Amino acid sequence: MAIGYPNGKKYAASHEGIPQKKRKAPVTYGKRGMSLEDDLNDTIAYYLAQDIAVIHKKPTPVQIVSVDYPKRSSAKIKEAYFKTPSTTDYNGVYKGKYIDFEAKETQNTTSFPLSNFHDHQMIHMANVLKQDGIVFVIIAFQKIGETYFIPFEKFYPFWQRMQSGGRKSVTIAEIQDVSDQIPYGLNPRLDFLKSIEKLYF
């Protein structure tokens, strides 16, 4: 039986205004957009709050050149420069030992470019190692969600190889051979002290 309106027009079912069921994307509980720096800052805040270790991110020294004062109570920096090259990202104390490390991340999936490091950082880390400090590098491969703890004494030969005209990157296989993988967790986010415990204590 056909259904019609009083004015003679035929009824046509309309699907407008009816919400369509959308297919939900699978939920992933991975990194959710956090950077390596965010993860490490959360981790060291946890260590400090739990009285486990005292580690800080070093501020980069800046030389302010020009300041604008639009109001008496506010100032706007118009021009500034980095004073000196920074050494490493983080330093602190754990179980009476000085620790110093650099953290880098890459979007590459098969290798890490050594151009992410600088001469002054390598010199600084080598000097800390000479003084018996615990020195290491944390490298995150963001696309594959893997993060590695590499003792500096095992990372430095890759830098020396590049300086001698060799490869300008380190393959992920080479990194896996000399490192300890840091799993992601909730609290702490990246428990790199487990790697320190395993390798140094």
From Swiss-Prot:
Keywords: Cytoplasm, DNA damage, DNA recombination, DNA repair, Endonuclease, Hydrolase, Magnesium, Metal-binding, Nuclease. It is found in: Cytoplasm. Its cofactor is Mg(2+). One of its GO terms (molecular function) is nucleic acid binding. The record marks 104 as: Transition state stabilizer. Pfam families: RecU. Belongs to the RecU family. This is Holliday junction resolvase RecU. It comes from Listeria welshimeri serovar 6b (strain ATCC 35897 / DSM 20650 / CCUG 15529 / CIP 8149 / NCTC 11857 / SLCC 5334 / V8).
